[in-house]
Every structure is written in C-alpha cells, then in structure tokens.
A protein has these predicted regions:
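Hot-dog-fold acyl-thioester-processing enzymes
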Residues: 2-90
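Hydrophobic beta-sheet segments that form the core/acyl-binding groove
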Residues: 90-106
Length: 106
C-alpha cells in the first residue's frame, strides 16, 4: 500500500499494510545527553565515547526509549492521531532490530 497523508484515525480505520510517512529526524549527541539527563540513564554505552568504542557496536548508541520517543513525536506530527488518541497505552511486539547511532536519520 502506498504512503498517504491521513488525519485523526481511529483503531478500526487502520488497515494491514497501511503506511504513514513521517519527516526524517537525525539523532544528535545533544539528544543522547539530554535524554540521559531527563531519564537518569547514564549507561556508558550511550554516554562514554571511549567505553562505547570498545563495546560490541564500536560507538555510542542512542537509548532505545529515546528513539521510541522521537518516533512517537514524528507520528504525532503527521496528524494521524489528531483528535483520536487519549493516551499511549501499549507498544506490543516492537523490537529494536539494529542500533541507532549519532548522525543516523530515522
């Protein structure tokens, strides 16, 4: 199904295979530092360049929940939740399939 612009969808209006395109957003070092301060998650894999360079991914990785928060914001900006969402209650069966690094655009 092709990407489309939509406004205010209810759950029963979503279709299997439906795609909603968002703007891109590049992850910055400031995003990671700010999220660490906000969340209290100062894990070295996110915040310590030297430590992260020796870890599995070879460089600092964005927090999974930071990426989820940015994705949520991008989704809101499309308008598909406009006037139809009361609360974000569940993200079911989501996986982080690959790391997101500083400079990556999602």
């Amino acid at each position: 199904m092709s990407a489309q612009k939509v406004r205010g969808l209810y759950f029963n209006q979503f279709e299997i295979g439906m795609q909603i395109t968002t703007q891109g957003r590049t992850i910055t070092e400031s995003d990671i530092v700010g999220f660490a301060g906000l969340s209290g998650d100062y894990n070295q894999i996110h915040t310590d360049k030297t430590y992260a360079s020796k870890a599995d991914f070879g460089k600092r990785v964005a927090h999974g929940l930071l990426v989820t928060s940015i994705v949520s914001g991008l989704a809101v900006q499309t308008g598909f939740m406009e006037g139809t969402v009361m609360a974000f209650r569940e993200i079911s069966q989501w996986k982080y399939s690959s790391p997101i690094f500083i400079g990556d655009t999602i």
